[in-house]
Amino acid sequence: ATTQCFIRTAQHPIHRRYCTKQQQFRYNCLNTWFYLDTMFVSTRSVRGYTCGQVFVNDTGFSRVYPMKSKSMAGKALSDLFSDVGVPTSLHTDGAKEMTIGHWKEVREKHGGIKQTTVEPYSPWQNRAEAEIRELKKQVTRIMDNSGAPKRLWDYCLEYVSELRSRTALGLPKLNGRTPYEFVTGETPDISEWTEFSFYQPVWYYNSSEFPEPRGVLGRWLGVSHRVGQALCYWILPESAEPISRTTVQAVSSDDLVTTKVQDLIIKYDKSVSDRLARGDNDITEDECIPT
């Protein structure tokens, strides 16, 4: 199958250059709508995020971009175009950060993408509202079961969104495919998500001097897409400042029952908890309130 995104005709003598600014053709063109909304939280994340922009379509594909402020919605839209592609249409609420300013500039720069908005006080008209509820539900369950600190919600949110998009659903429209494949046309490679689960204890390589051990205890936070190459992961070390590493191994079930490793994990968890508890991490109403 083929497609044709534009056509150029020549009926008159040349008097000026053709337009060379075709920003919308730098990225994949997606044959889908995206519904979107801003997700608000009560705790500032370890990376300083206070909210997140959620994009979802009608087949269950979702993409989340944590943000330090709701005013960064335009950057999240630009990142979506770069990471996934440019959709045919957008459907939002009437918030200013999703209709004017940087948002409008990004939308017009990529071909003037059609945008519609919901009727005021009618959140049921936006699929992103239901997706946010599902994301919150799954993030809460995973963080409770794993014992992860609340300030790691942004890593868990991205992890859940990526898993949902790569899980085949029972929707007739998908015909047995994953939402990711339906939207992008590519079969998703799940290699980076099969070996570890969120906040799982792991050993990661540390280039320390002799006689310090090279394998150091940490916890797995997700895939680090913008650092290194494939199979590079976010790891939470004892310093509570996430790092990216490729050389990572799960702590084996045999090691987990030994007194030595159990003591290491207790010491690690206390150190992380103490470090993440420092400072005021609650979000004030002036920082990130919905409009």
What positions do the PLM features span?
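Surface-exposed, charged/polar loop-rich segments
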Residues: 112, 117-173
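Retroviral integrase
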Residues: 1-137, 181-291
